[in-house]
């Protein structure tokens, strides 16, 4: 027993050593059956991850190394406390501490690996990116690097795919991406600022290769590319004779200057002033002008900014200047050169000329000083007086204007202004002098200014003349419908005018146009001119016979209505031969001349006198009322000439008949209906005449084709065969087309007659020789239509025998004609009469 006691401890120790390790752990340490787990992100795990074996007397807790708030221990089980997110934490760790009585016995670690899931969309670092691209950027160069266009995806394992979509049509031809996974922007073709100054793209990124893959996320951004123009083109002198936007064939300028004069203004060149602009309009650098060759003696100066070419010194003799003008950009990068040809021409020094001899203006009554006189033809526009140099248009700017004989008005440039308040209505005449400060030439013209009660109305109803006034308000009306029977070549203008109008104060010299007629000058269209009485015994002479009255050319007639002259006055009408030129007009001009009270004498121009009259555009009618008080009113005599003021508008009587208006639409429609009916009747009459004269021919053409006419030797001088009375053969001298053919030695058979040839008269055949010498010859020849022709010559036919040629076909003897042709030699020559075979195709002599 003692030996067993000695062996017991070693056996017990050996048994303890050979026991399984797990049995010892279960008895003394904490344990788990699995310490590594895999969980997809965004998965809510509610089941316990692992069960913890805790020995009796021990407790388990989470250590400090555990992922905060990720786990919890409930009982002896480990739970996942959060929804895992791969982008936030891809690996979760739980530290398990087993303690017994505050003493750490076992330490365990459990790991949770979070699996990545494609749950995030890619994002661009920008919404819109705007890039400036130089126009001269080389092709295949990278415009925007990859790093500036990459998108970011929180799913770190995702591969992004990029697509460039155009928003500007055709923009994809210029730019593209380097590859589908590399979003660098590359230039594919040269840029053109003028064709496409800017382009817009839509950049799209996707985190899957295809659109149908689930899940798939996309993102977009906008790219704006602004093309910056490059300095590629030099300045262009305009206008280009040819330009396609890239190349300009520059203009060359031409001008002329008078010798011995210095022009006060820049030269007027053709095709326009010197002007250049930057060929790169996007850059549009300012242009600096200079003359670097051809400026002999410094004759010309060019403005460096505007390019205006002026004369610095006069040219003594005619010559030609060839100036080379350079236009250079302000940044001195590029320049261009053109040629300016200036010819110095000897000037005759002609005075300036006015395009009109009479200008008409209007201004409201009561207008103060400094009011602009309006144009009577266009009341909304100021009246402009412009003279022109007949030789050099460059000298027009050197012309100054002034009013020489009136203190109520003044010139300011080309515009007429009032100098005082116009309190009285009427017509004023002022003379304007144009003075060329270079050539010292002068010219004058006349302005007729109507002072009316109010601004010229735009309606066509003229206001009634004011009571007691000598001149009613002047109005201008325009009608588009011509009023028959007065001829009109344009819109009819009616203006009311009156007498002489108010007189200027003392010291003012009025110089109206030379006219013995105080009434307003006729206008451009239908016009009426009232000539008031001449009180106080004054004498108004009208043209006498034989006088010549120069009047501007007009279209229409001149009618003069001259009432009786009471109080013993005489009224003389124009005598034959009187030439009374009227103002050029396209309508009718009527001149009313009131009576001449106070015993005055109103004489019409005598023969040979000249009375200028205002130009009209149509017919002029002059109404001359009675001249009371014993005055004498003489009408123009033949040959007189009455010059009157030139005008283009027609003053009409204010208070004329209201029926002198345009026709209404109903009137024109009625006139059109009448004209249409007349046209229809004319067409019907024409149809009847055509049917009467050409009806048989039309029936013949529409019916059976006519029988072919025989073509023989017809003598039109003889009567047809159906006539009973035979006429002798006419003499060759009476034949309209005599054809004398010499008689051959022996008669030859006649050839085929041409369709259009005229047969020889038989008289000419007899003149060739004696009929007794003629032998009988029978000839036949094939005609084109298949018939035969037979000719017989008689030997014993006397000279007194009549020769008759028959070739008059008839419709009822065709058979006889055929039989006559077949019976060729049986007495047809002498015994057969002309009636044997009428209408046959044979000629019997």
UniProtKB/Swiss-Prot annotation:
Keyword Calcium: yes
PROSITE patterns xrefs: CADHERIN_1, CADHERIN_2
Post-translational events: N- and O-glycosylated.
Annotated phenotype, changing residue 109 to G: Loss of binding to CDHR2
Residues where Phosphoserine is found: 770, 817, 819, 821
Protein source organism: Homo sapiens
GO cellular component terms attached to this protein's record: apical plasma membrane; brush border membrane; clathrin-coated pit; extracellular exosome; microvillus; microvillus membrane; plasma membrane
Tissue expression summary: Highest expression in kidney, liver, colon and small intestine. In kidney, expressed apically along brush border of proximal convoluted tubule but not in cortical collecting ducts. Isoform 1 is expressed primarily in adult small intestine and colon. Isoform 2 is highly expressed in fetal liver. Expressed in duodenum with higher expression in enterocytes along the villus axis and lower expression in crypts (at protein level).
Full protein name: Cadherin-related family member 5
Annotated function: Intermicrovillar adhesion molecule that forms, via its extracellular domain, calcium-dependent heterophilic complexes with CDHR2 on adjacent microvilli. Thereby, controls the packing of microvilli at the apical membrane of epithelial cells. Through its cytoplasmic domain, interacts with microvillus cytoplasmic proteins to form the intermicrovillar adhesion complex/IMAC. This complex plays a central role in microvilli and epithelial brush border differentiation.
Residues where Phosphothreonine is found: 810
Molecular function (Gene Ontology), one example: cell adhesion molecule binding
Biased composition (Polar residues): 539-549, 556-594, 602-611
Keyword field contains Calcium: yes
Glycosylation sites: 44, 81, 140, 198, 297, 308, 405, 526
Bilayer topology annotation: Single-pass type I membrane protein
N-terminal signal peptide: 1-25
Sequence repeat intervals: 540-570, 571-601, 602-631, 632-645
Subcellular localization, as worded in the UniProt entry: Apical cell membrane; Cell projection, Microvillus membrane
Biological process per Gene Ontology, one example term: regulation of microvillus length
Chain ranges on the Cytoplasmic side, renumbered to this chain: 691-845
Source species, domain of life: Eukaryota
Region: 4 X 31 AA approximate tandem repeats, residue numbers: 540-645
């Amino acid at each position: 027993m003692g030996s067993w006691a000695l062996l017991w401890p070693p056996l017990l120790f050996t048994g303890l050593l050979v026991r399984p390790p797990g049995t010892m752990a279960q008895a003394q340490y904490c344990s788990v059956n699995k310490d590594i787990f895999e969980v997809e992100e965004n998965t809510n795990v509610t089941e316990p991850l692992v069960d913890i074996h805790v020995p009796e007397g021990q407790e388990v807790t989470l250590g400090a190394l555990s992922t905060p708030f990720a786990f919890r221990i409930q009982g002896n089980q480990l739970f996942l406390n959060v929804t895992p997110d791969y982008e936030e934490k891809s690996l979760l760790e739980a530290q398990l501490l087993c303690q017994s009585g505050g003493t750490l016995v076992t330490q365990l670690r459990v790991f949770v690996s979070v699996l990545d899931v494609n749950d995030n969309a890619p994002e661009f670092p920008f919404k819109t990116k705007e890039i400036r691209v130089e126009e001269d950027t080389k092709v295949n160069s990278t415009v925007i690097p990859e790093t500036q266009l990459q998108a970011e995806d929180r799913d770190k394992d995702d591969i992004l795919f990029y697509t460039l979509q155009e928003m500007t049509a055709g923009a994809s031809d210029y730019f593209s991406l380097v590859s589908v996974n590399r979003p660098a922007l590359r230039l594919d073709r040269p840029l053109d600022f003028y064709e496409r100054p800017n382009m817009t793209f839509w950049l799209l990124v996707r985190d899957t290769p295809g659109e149908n893959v689930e899940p798939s996320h996309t993102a977009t951004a906008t790219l704006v590319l602004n093309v910056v123009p490059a300095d590629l083109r030099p300045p262009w002198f305009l206008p280009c004779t040819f330009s396609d936007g890239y190349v300009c064939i520059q203009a060359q300028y031409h001008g002329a200057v008078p010798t011995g004069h210095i022009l006060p203004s820049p030269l007027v060149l053709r095709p326009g002033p010197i002007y250049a602009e930057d060929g790169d309009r996007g850059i549009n650098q300012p242009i600096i002008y200079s003359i670097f060759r051809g400026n002999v003696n410094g004759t010309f100066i060019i403005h460096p900014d505007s390019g205006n070419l002026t004369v610095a010194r006069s040219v003594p003799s005619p010559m030609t200047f060839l100036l080379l003008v350079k236009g250079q950009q302000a940044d001195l990068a590029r320049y261009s050169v053109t040629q300016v040809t200036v010819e110095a021409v000897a000037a005759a020094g002609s005075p300036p000329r006015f395009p009109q001899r009479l200008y008409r203006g209007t201004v409201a009554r009561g207008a103060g000083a400094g009011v602009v006189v309006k144009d009577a033809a266009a009341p909304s526009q100021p009246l402009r007086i412009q003279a022109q140099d007949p030789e050099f248009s460059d000298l027009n700017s050197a012309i100054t204007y002034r009013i020489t004989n009136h203190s109520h008005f003044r010139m300011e440039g080309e515009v007429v202004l009032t100098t005082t308040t116009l309190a009285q209505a009427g017509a004023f005449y002022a003379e304007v002098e144009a003075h060329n400060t270079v050539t010292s030439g002068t010219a004058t013209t006349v302005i007729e200014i109507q002072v009316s009660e109010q601004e010229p109305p735009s309606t066509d109803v003229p206001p009634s003349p004011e009571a007691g006034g000598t001149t009613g308000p002047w109005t201008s009306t325009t009608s588009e419908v011509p009023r028959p029977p007065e001829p009109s070549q344009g819109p009819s203008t009616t203006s009311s005018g009156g007498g002489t109008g108010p007189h200027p104060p003392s010291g003012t010299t009025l110089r109206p146009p030379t006219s013995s007629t105080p009434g307003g000058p006729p206008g451009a269209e239908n016009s009426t001119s009232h000539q008031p009485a001449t009180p106080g015994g004054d004498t108004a002479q009208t043209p006498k016979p034989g006088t010549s009255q120069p009047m501007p050319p007009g279209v229409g007639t001149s009618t003069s209505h001259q009432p009786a002259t009471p109080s013993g006055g005489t009224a003389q009408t124009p005598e034959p031969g009187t030439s009374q030129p009227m103002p050029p007009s396209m309508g009718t001009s009527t001149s009313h001349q009131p009576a001449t009270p106070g015993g005055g004498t109103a004489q019409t121009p005598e023969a040979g006198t000249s009375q200028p009259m205002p130009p009209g555009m149509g017919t002029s009618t002059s109404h001359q009322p009675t001249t009371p008080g014993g005055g004498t009113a003489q009408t123009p005599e033949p040959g007189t000439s009455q010059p009157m003021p030139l005008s283009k508008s027609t003053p009409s009587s204010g208070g004329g008949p209201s029926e002198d208006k345009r026709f209404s639409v109903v009137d024109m429609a009625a006139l059109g209906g009448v004209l249409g009916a007349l046209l229809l009747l004319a067409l019907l009459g024409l149809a009847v005449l055509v049917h009467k004269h050409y009806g048989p021919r039309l029936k013949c053409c529409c019916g059976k084709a006519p029988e072919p006419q025989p073509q023989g030797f017809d003598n039109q001088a003889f009567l047809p065969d159906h006539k009973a009375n035979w006429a002798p053969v006419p003499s060759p001298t009476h034949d309209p087309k005599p054809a004398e053919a010499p008689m051959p030695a022996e008669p030859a058979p006649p050839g085929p007659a041409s369709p259009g040839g005229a047969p020889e008269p038989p008289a000419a055949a007899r003149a060739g020789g004696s009929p007794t010498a003629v032998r009988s010859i029978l000839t036949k020849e094939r005609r084109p239509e298949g018939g035969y022709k037979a000719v017989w010559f008689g030997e014993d036919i006397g000279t007194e025998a009549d020769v008759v040629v028959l070739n008059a076909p008839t419709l009822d003897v065709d058979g006889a004609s055929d039989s006559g042709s077949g019976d060729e030699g049986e007495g047809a020559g002498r015994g057969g009469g002309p009636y044997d075979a009428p209408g046959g195709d044979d000629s019997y002599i």
